[in-house]
Curated annotation (Swiss-Prot):
The keyword Amino-acid biosynthesis does not apply. This is NAD(P)H-quinone oxidoreductase subunit K, chloroplastic. Its main location: plastid. NCBIfam families: nuoB_fam, PRK06411.1. NDH is composed of at least 16 different subunits, 5 of which are encoded in the nucleus. GO terms for molecular function: 4 iron, 4 sulfur cluster binding; iron ion binding; NADH dehydrogenase (ubiquinone) activity; quinone binding. Pfam families: Oxidored_q6 (PF01058). Keywords: 4Fe-4S, Chloroplast, Iron, Iron-sulfur, Membrane, Metal-binding, NAD, NADP, Plastid, Plastoquinone, Quinone, Thylakoid, Translocase, Transport. It catalyses: a plastoquinone + NADH + (n+1) H(+)(in) = a plastoquinol + NAD(+) + n H(+)(out); a plastoquinone + NADPH + (n+1) H(+)(in) = a plastoquinol + NADP(+) + n H(+)(out). Belongs to the complex I 20 kDa subunit family. Binds 1 [4Fe-4S] cluster.
Amino acid sequence: MNSTEFPLLDRTTQNSVISTTLNDLSNWSRLSSLWPLLYGTSCCFIEFASLIGSRFDFDRYGLVPRSSPRQADLILTAGTVTMKMAPSLVRLYEQMPEPKYVIAMGACTITGGMFSTDSYSTVRGVDKLIPVDVYLPGCPPKPEAVIDAITKLRKKVSREIYQDRIGSQQENRCFTTNHKFHIERSTHTGNYGQGLLYQSPSTSEIPSETFFKYKSSVSSHELMN
């Protein structure tokens, strides 16, 4: 803005009134203050790490990485999520204050990737655990794609209504799809599953009263046969 534009700006702002709603003001203030919690478990997270450098400079979007979920309003999941990691991911999401958003980055996070076909311990999509706002496919996605996903999330934030978002989250909660597994007793206890096998009692384990009672009840005709 040069010096010739200042008088025009003064004339327009002296008699101008900006009218807005509290919801729009809240959305506008959050557009450039997204604080992400980085949840990376695989190679996709390396592509996100390149955004921190000077070439892409993701600080210009107001992104400030946080190490605590209580200080973050955006969680970016990248990589494979296993069954053992699922409770930790849900716990991190629940500790984030409202409003909060999720970006699923990479094929392994969205669908389980190549590990979902033969693996029994891979979660087939992070949206089965937490609600996802933006899906970012790729193996791995490029840094430009991550910037595009953040731009789309900012557009979604600018148009959303807070009450509608709370209502949709209560209707579409996490754990929508159950993984069908049958829990059985573990046989790797050092006993080689002996508790699961039937063992006939030996003669020494039978009480003497039972043995002589059975012997006296047998007739001589049965003994001859």
